[in-house]
């Protein structure tokens, strides 16, 4: 057993008391991102090492792996604690998203270590989708790079409001305050173009040497701010979903016997209580909440993020993908929306194409009506394009095969986030964040069917010499 863990258990008075104490700690999900070789995996390894989260057998294995795959000479290569794939260790880079868990006396943490290479941007977006804070690493020798801008933009696009800019490898620039100040000013100039009201903090550190990671650096007396760990332990995360109206997407209908019929899922936002009048969408049928069932018994109320089963007073038709909300709330179903898209497939996204989509447990089909623009990550400008390439980010107009109940992603990530699925391979090819649902009154009707639009796109792609016009060219 880890000696630090054994000491914590002893201090709490036993395993059971320690587990209860763990349950009451707040949880922070964060990711590390930045350009290639900025030291993301090394930083996570340093956090695990300095908070004494490494078991003795892991430490022994790390010594052996450092000799075989290490990139730090005689020193421990802490990045190997996180880079688990054989290809990652051989190349000295991160490819997949690696998740690690650790805790301190103040908080629990789940870390997502995301890849820095541009071709793995889709992996980074996957890691960011569940996080509340992003650590953006910048190599003190290189300053702000294109990939730093890309990751900053994706993080904010996915709703992350707390950014910690960790200026790493300060030991390689002689712990220069001038270098730190210059990079800080450069990043703030860029960050002024990012959307939203952001909480941005700066920490100069050396992940390799441990400066300002978990303890104050003696080499940077000019820096009087908190260490990285202190920032992580004290940052206050305001969850947007807590203040939003009730949203309960039904994941499945639970009917173990003839006497029980419940609707299971995770409360996406708001709160629900016994006796509350609720409405089922898209049908619009209303009922009252009779019971709120959880794994440890019935409750009188439940809050966002909790897995529950709702039992209603009436026997009504509800299936997977339906949405329950307060009966007095007017939320119309829509068949069109503008969506911010991060494209993850080799074949570009083009107007006229159709994909299966999944959103809040519901699966349906969507047609790409047009691409308004692609974002140039270097300067955050918008430019017109015919299609959206691999790792491209842009605003896309979609039309759905059936009415859907949507929220803007920034208001509710569960009912505003969707994925694109290729209909032939069943592979996830893109991630979407609802920018704005389009009401039926403002949606422009299409004079062409979905089949005609898809056939037109195929002809233009494979037989360009025919000179077929783009049926959506006026959009």
UniProtKB/Swiss-Prot annotation:
Reactions mediated catalytically: sulfate + ATP + H(+) = adenosine 5'-phosphosulfate + diphosphate
Keywords: ATP-binding, GTP-binding, Nucleotide-binding, Nucleotidyltransferase, Transferase
Stored InterPro entries: CysN_GTP-bd, CysN_II, CysN_NoDQ_III, G_TR_CS, GTP-eEF1A_C, P-loop_NTPase, Small_GTP-bd, SO4_adenylTrfase_lsu
EC number in record: 2.7.7.4
First-tier enzyme category under EC: transferase
Region annotation G3: where it falls in the sequence: 113-116
Keyword RNA-binding attributed: no
One GO-annotated biological process of the protein: hydrogen sulfide biosynthetic process
Domain of life per record: Bacteria
Domain tr-type G: 25-239
Segments of this protein annotated with the region G4: 168-171
Stretches the record annotates as G1: 34-41
Molecular function GO labels: ATP binding; GTP binding; GTPase activity; sulfate adenylyltransferase (ATP) activity
Gene3D superfamilies: P-loop containing nucleotide triphosphate hydrolases, Translation factors
Binding site for GTP: 34-41, 113-117, 168-171
Chain spans, region G2: 92-96
Pathway the protein takes part in: Sulfur metabolism; hydrogen sulfide biosynthesis; sulfite from sulfate: step 1/3
Ranges where the record places region G5: 206-208
Subunit annotation: Heterodimer composed of CysD, the smaller subunit, and CysN.
Function: With CysD forms the ATP sulfurylase (ATPS) that catalyzes the adenylation of sulfate producing adenosine 5'-phosphosulfate (APS) and diphosphate, the first enzymatic step in sulfur assimilation pathway. APS synthesis involves the formation of a high-energy phosphoric-sulfuric acid anhydride bond driven by GTP hydrolysis by CysN coupled to ATP hydrolysis by CysD.
NCBIfam families given in the database record: CysN (TIGR02034), PRK05124.1 (NF003478), small_GTP (TIGR00231)
Family under the similarity heading: Belongs to the TRAFAC class translation factor GTPase superfamily. Classic translation factor GTPase family. CysN/NodQ subfamily.
Protein name per Swiss-Prot or TrEMBL: Sulfate adenylyltransferase subunit 1
Organism (species): Escherichia coli (strain ATCC 8739 / DSM 1576 / NBRC 3972 / NCIMB 8545 / WDCM 00012 / Crooks)
Name of the coding gene: cysN
């Amino acid at each position: 057993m880890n000696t630090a863990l054994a000491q914590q258990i002893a201090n709490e008075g036993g395993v059971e008391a320690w587990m209860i104490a763990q349950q009451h700690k707040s949880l922070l999900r964060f990711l590390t991102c930045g350009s290639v070789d900025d030291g993301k995996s090394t930083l996570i390894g340093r956090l695990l090492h300095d908070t004494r989260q490494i078991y003795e057998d892991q430490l022994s294995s790390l010594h052996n792996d450092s000799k075989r795959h290490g990139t730090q000479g005689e020193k421990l290569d802490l990045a190997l604690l996180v880079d688990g794939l054989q290809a990652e260790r051989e190349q000295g880079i991160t490819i997949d998203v690696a998740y690690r868990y650790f805790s301190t006396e103040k908080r629990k943490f789940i870390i997502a270590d995301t890849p820095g290479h541009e071709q793995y941007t889709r992996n980074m977006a996957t890691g960011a989708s569940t996080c509340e804070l992003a650590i953006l690493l910048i190599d003190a020798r290189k300053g702000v790079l294109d990939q730093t801008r890309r990751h900053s933009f994706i993080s904010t696009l996915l709703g992350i409001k707390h950014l910690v800019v960790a200026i790493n490898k300060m030991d390689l620039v002689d712990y220069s305050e001038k270098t730190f100040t210059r990079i800080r000013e450069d990043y703030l100039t860029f960050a002024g173009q990012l959307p939203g009201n952001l909480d941005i903090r700066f920490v100069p550190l050396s992940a390799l040497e441990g400066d300002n990671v978990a303890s104050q650096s003696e080499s940077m007396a000019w820096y009087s701010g908190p260490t990285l760990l202190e920032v992580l332990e004290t940052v206050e995360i305001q969850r947007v979903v807590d203040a939003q109206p009730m949203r309960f997407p039904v994941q499945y209908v639970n009917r173990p016997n003839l006497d029980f019929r419940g609707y299971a899922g995770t409360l996406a936002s708001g709160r629900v209580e016994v006796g509350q009048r609720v409405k089922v969408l898209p049908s619009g049928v209303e009922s009252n909440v009779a019971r709120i069932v959880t794994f440890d018994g019935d409750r009188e109320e439940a809050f966002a993020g909790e897995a529950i089963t709702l039992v209603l007073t009436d026997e009504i038709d509800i299936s997977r993908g339906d949405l329950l909300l307060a009966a007095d709330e007017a939320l119309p179903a829509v068949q069109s929306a503008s969506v911010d898209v991060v494209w993850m497939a080799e074949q570009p996204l083009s107007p006229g194409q159709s994909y299966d989509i999944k959103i809040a447990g519901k699966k349906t089909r969507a047609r790409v009506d047009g691409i308004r623009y692609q974002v140039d990550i270097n300067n955050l400008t918008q430019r017109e394009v015919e299609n959206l390439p691999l790792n491209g980010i842009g605003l896309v107009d979609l039309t759905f095969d059936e009415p859907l109940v949507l929220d803007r992603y920034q208001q509710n990530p569960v009912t505003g986030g969707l994925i694109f699925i290729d209909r032939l391979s069943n592979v996830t090819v893109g991630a979407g964040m609802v920018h704005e649902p389009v009401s039926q009154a403002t949606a422009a009707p299409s004079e062409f069917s979905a089949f005609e639009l898809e056939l037109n796109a195929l002809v233009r792609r494979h037989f360009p010499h025919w000179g077929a016009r783009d049926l959506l060219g006026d959009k």
